[in-house]
Amino acid sequence: MVPIAAIRRKLMDGSISHNELDELKKDQRKGVQELLKRYQAQQEKQQTLIQMHKQMWRYEQELKQRGYVAVCGVDEVGRGPLAGPVTACACILPDDFQLLGLTDSKKLSKAKREEYAKMISEQAVAYSIASVSAAEIDEINILQATKKAMTKAINGLSQKTDHLLLDAVRLDVPIAQTSLIKGDAKSLSIAASSVLAKVWRDRYMEELAQTYPGYGFDTHAGYGTASHLQALRTYGMTPEHRKSFRPVLEESQGLIYGT
């Protein structure tokens, strides 16, 4: 009888054969059946991730079949916060790109986003990140600022793109484009841009927390949490706050940080 420790090793390293799996199903030892159950659950999860990856790659593949060469995903983060920039990323992935589990950055943990961002940046054909400041958001409004950040990111690419995949927006640029509702959960290129933009902006807000202690920018990234609203009432607005966003003026009562 094969020791349970040996079975565990074979299951973990993937060296077990179909015949061996069939034999394990007949093994009545509780430890073996528990190992087998976990293994099967992992295999099912892996297959789910593979299918999701294929599904999220279909837009890029269809565009390549139509003759487009450099399909670029574009996404933004930071439209809703009361402070900080709106940040966009444009990303072109290679044809053989594979990163199982990649999806909308909002669905990933901070640790996963950091891990994936490193892998994406290493594998990408090209990517570019751009931001528009809170002051400029106040001048031109958040929608126009978002589009400007996206356009800046596209223009910053080291390789020219011939088709854009966008998340529920259209840009006034002379490039063919496809807009997808909830695109960051439907396209790998958009998801990759979502992750890169999110990680970059979060790091920016963490640095901002050192400049303006007491606001908690490193925890809420500028969103209107209860603690952030309280900080506005206590300390007032910083230059990084969006004065055109009603809660900023209402909660700060016009108080300026440091005065």
UniProtKB/Swiss-Prot annotation:
- Write out the function statement from the record: Endonuclease that specifically degrades the RNA of RNA-DNA hybrids.
Q: Which residues cross the membrane?
A: none
Q: What is this protein's record name?
A: Ribonuclease HII
Instruction: Specify the enzyme's EC class, one word.
Output: hydrolase
Q: Which GO terms describe its molecular function?
A: manganese ion binding; RNA binding; RNA-DNA hybrid ribonuclease activity
> Recorded E.C. number(s)?
3.1.26.4
Names of required cofactors: Mn(2+); Mg(2+)
Chain's gene name: rnhB
Family stated for the protein in its record: Belongs to the RNase HII family.
- Quote the PANTHER family the UniProt record gives: RIBONUCLEASE H2 SUBUNIT A (PTHR10954), RIBONUCLEASE HII (PTHR10954:SF18)
Q: Where does a divalent metal cation bind?
A: D75, E76, D167
* UniProt-listed NCBIfam families: PRK00015.1-1, PRK00015.1-3
Does the record's keyword annotation contain Metal-binding? Answer: yes
What processes in GO biological process is this protein linked to?
Answer: DNA replication, removal of RNA primer; mismatch repair
Q: Does the keyword Metal-binding apply?
A: yes
Signal peptide bounds = none
